[in-house]
Amino acid sequence: MRVRKRKGAEEHLENHPEYVIMNPEDIKGHWKEVFGNDHPIHIEVGSGKGGFITGKALQNPEINYIGIDIQLSVLSYALDKVLESNAPNVKLLRVDGSSLTNYFENGEIDLLYLNFSDPWPKTKHEKRRLTYKDFLETYKQILPEHGEIHFKTDNRGLFEYSLASFSQFGMTLKQVWLDLHASDFEGNVMTEYEEKFSKKGQVIYRVEAFF
């Protein structure tokens, strides 16, 4: 999700250390201590403006959530959502999805979400797609054995690519939705993009896959 540069975004993040972890490399292996409990930890890579991660945190207080985004301004908007919700089970990180092993120990994360990732449609940009094999290798390291990825998108091309990428990597497709909003799936938390696209009548695709 690309947004205009937000004035004061960095200062805004720095002023809320209770939610924004500025030195995540120092916490590797100790995330349960940060949350102060032994609850499962779920992360969203590319958390955008925080609608999904905040909604999930409110929906599931027994689960800890970490929203990850590399864009400073975007993360500052996510912080607004977290502050508004007052959810105690959310943390935010400004890091790149390719470097997650620098911040999380093997098996430290219980589940990983990818929502409306940039499709990078050009073949020469394949390695930038968050479901490319190199990213999957990174995710596999921080997830437990048979750890799951839950992926949503409105982009059919990226969805088909991701299904193939998961399968070629040796993952198992647990369940696939070719029209999520027309299904009987319960508990769906929509992202900002999802709300926008669904109002236009666009189909939303979803898959749950595990290693």
UniProtKB/Swiss-Prot annotation:
Residues 124-129 are annotated as: Interaction with RNA. SUPFAM superfamilies: S-adenosyl-L-methionine-dependent methyltransferases (SSF53335). Pathway: tRNA modification; N(7)-methylguanine-tRNA biosynthesis. It holds the Pfam family Methyltransf_4. CDD domains: AdoMet_MTases. The active site is at 118. InterPro entries: SAM-dependent_MTases_sf (IPR029063), tRNA_(Gua-N-7)_MeTrfase_Trmb (IPR003358), tRNA_methyltr_TrmB_bact (IPR055361). GO terms for molecular function: tRNA (guanine(46)-N7)-methyltransferase activity. It catalyses: guanosine(46) in tRNA + S-adenosyl-L-methionine = N(7)-methylguanosine(46) in tRNA + S-adenosyl-L-homocysteine. GO terms for cellular component: tRNA methyltransferase complex. Keywords: Methyltransferase, S-adenosyl-L-methionine, Transferase, tRNA processing. S-adenosyl-L-methionine binds at residues 44, 69, 96, 118. Transmembrane segments: none annotated. Substrate binds at residues 122, 154, 191-194. Catalyzes the formation of N(7)-methylguanine at position 46 (m7G46) in tRNA. Belongs to the class I-like SAM-binding methyltransferase superfamily. TrmB family. This is tRNA (guanine-N(7)-)-methyltransferase. It comes from Streptococcus uberis (strain ATCC BAA-854 / 0140J).
